[in-house]
């Protein structure tokens, strides 16, 4: 009965048509066949729709392209994608960005663990160095940081790591979970919407786990996890004004909702330290402070100031 359940993949894209094509090829090659694929195009300007027509994707009942009237960011894209799948009655939803590439057996290794009340992720590996994690993993309730597959294998963890996922990179969840938890917050626009959705899962007591034999490949951003504070802490620096602003605003919002004001103060301290002492930048500090202020105020209207 489990094997008969329908699964729809949601891919959010913006101006990366060649990477999108790689992602779609990997989805089509899955050994556990998908029921449907929906691509949410965030009003791309690189000819994404025509490109998909040229590569014979749009003439299939297996595939749906939804082009949004404006760029709503990853948060808006996943909001609309999950909403589409939920409203069309699919049993399970598989989430990813256009630059992700699941291994051919990724879904086949995830799906046996799927229930109507869990939120599963694969291991997310650096597409150029697949023996390393794309995003370092910190085991729940510990200070243990995992950077490589060898780090994980040394722990002899069987089947799954409970309590942790790298959200929206090959995440598998059921429509029953969406019915209970709702959709991602589109007002977040980008950066932090995935963490908010995962925190909401925990609040609703949805089981969370990473499946250790399921692999998902993704480009690594070297600016993420920059060491600071005598190498005791790490900060997600970015050259993008938009991402920096949204990260600070959304992180404050998430800490207010799901952590404590101590966490809010810690994030503020960490950000001020980083752009004052670790990598001094008055312009970035100004953007970060603006994001922090709007996060405290619950104002989600100003990210458009940084859209080109």
Task: Give the residues covered by each predicted segment.
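Short, acidic, metal-binding catalytic loop of nucleotide-sugar glycosyltransferases
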Residues: 25-35
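A conserved acidic beta->alpha catalytic loop
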Residues: 26, 41-51, 70, 100-101
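Glycine-rich, basic loop-to-helix element that forms the pyrophosphate-binding segment
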Residues: 68-88
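Short beta-strand-to-loop acidic/aromatic patch adjacent to the donor-nucleotide binding site
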Residues: 89-99
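Conserved donor NDP-sugar-binding/catalytic core segment of glycosyltransferases
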Residues: 105-136
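A recurrent flexible, glycine/aromatic-enriched loop bordering the glycosyltransferase active site
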Residues: 153-173
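A short, conserved alpha-helix in the catalytic core of glycosyltransferases
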Residues: 171, 177-181, 187-214
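Non-catalytic, C-terminal membrane-associated alpha-helical segments of glycosyltransferases
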Residues: 256-308
């Amino acid at each position: 009965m489990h094997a008969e359940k329908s699964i729809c993949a949601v891919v959010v894209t913006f101006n990366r048509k060649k990477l999108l094509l790689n992602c779609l090829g990997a989805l089509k090659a899955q050994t556990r066949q998908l029921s449907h694929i929906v691509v949410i195009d965030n009003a791309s300007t690189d000819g994404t729709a025509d490109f998909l027509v040229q590569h014979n994707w749009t003439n299939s009942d297996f595939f749906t392209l939804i082009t949004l009237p404006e760029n709503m960011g990853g948060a808006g894209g996943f909001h609309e994608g999950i909403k589409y799948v939920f409203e069309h009655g699919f049993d399970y939803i598989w989430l990813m960005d256009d630059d992700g590439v699941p291994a051919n057996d990724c879904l086949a290794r995830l799906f046996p663990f799927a229930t109507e009340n869990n939120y599963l992720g694969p291991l997310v590996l650096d597409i150029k160095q697949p023996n390393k994690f794309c995003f370092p993993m910190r085991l729940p309730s510990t200070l243990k940081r995992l950077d490589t597959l060898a780090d994980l294998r040394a722990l002899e963890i069987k089947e799954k790591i409970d309590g942790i996922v790298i959200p929206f990179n090959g995440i598998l969840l059921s429509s029953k979970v969406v019915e209970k938890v709702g959709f991602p917050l589109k007002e977040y626009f980008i950066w932090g919407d995935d963490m908010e959705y995962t925190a909401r899962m925990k609040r609703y007591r949805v089981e969370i786990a990473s499946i250790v034999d399921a692999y998902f490949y993704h480009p690594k951003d070297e600016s993420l996890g920059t060491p600071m504070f005598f190498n005791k802490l790490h900060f997600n620096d970015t050259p993008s004004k938009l991402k920096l602003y949204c990260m600070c605003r959304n992180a404050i919002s998430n800490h207010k909702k799901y952590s404590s004001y101590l966490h809010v103060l810690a994030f503020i301290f960490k950000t001020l330290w980083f752009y004052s002492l670790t990598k001094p930048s008055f312009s970035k500090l100004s953007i970060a402070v603006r994001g922090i202020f709007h996060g405290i105020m619950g104002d989600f209207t100003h990210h458009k100031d940084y859209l080109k």
